Amino acid sequence: MIDLNALCSECGVKFYADELISENSRQIYRVYITKKNGVNLDDCEALSRLLSPILDVEPPTSGAFTLEVSSPGLERKLTTPSNFENSLGELVKITLKNGEKISGEILSFKDEILKLKTAENNEISVNFNEIKKAKTYIEW
């Protein structure tokens, strides 16, 4: 199994997430990376050059695929504890498993507990296991 965290570190970036999708009957393996002060094209190219020969030997799927390396974007899904830890100070919209929707600024994430400050300046805590989906957002 490929250690994407270690390979990303070699390129000076952090591994965020990966996915294998099918678009127009093509398999695409996407690797998302982050970096303080933002990811640039050179970062994506460096990781792509490092990953390509490794994926030729250990492909993420059977058959042909295209490798894409990019930033997850300003508005992105938060699916893992490390996604939340790396998004401190950002705004997030969350849907809980019980259907309740909440939003606010991420204050902290520790021991699987997310602390948010809502628009009403209330501080709330949410257990990671209660989150159905979460996504950062930008106020323009």
Curated annotation (Swiss-Prot):
Q: Which GO terms describe its cellular component?
A: cytosol
Subcellular location per the Swiss-Prot or TrEMBL entry: Cytoplasm
Q: Which domain of life is it from?
A: Bacteria
Single GO BP term: ribosomal small subunit assembly
User: Where does the UniProt entry say this protein principally localizes?
Assistant: cytoplasm
Q: What are the alphabetically sorted keywords of the record? A: Cytoplasm, Ribosome biogenesis
Query: Known NCBIfam families for this protein?
Result: PRK14639.1
What's this chain's function? Answer: Required for maturation of 30S ribosomal subunits.
Record-stated family: Belongs to the RimP family.
Q: What is this protein called?
A: Ribosome maturation factor RimP
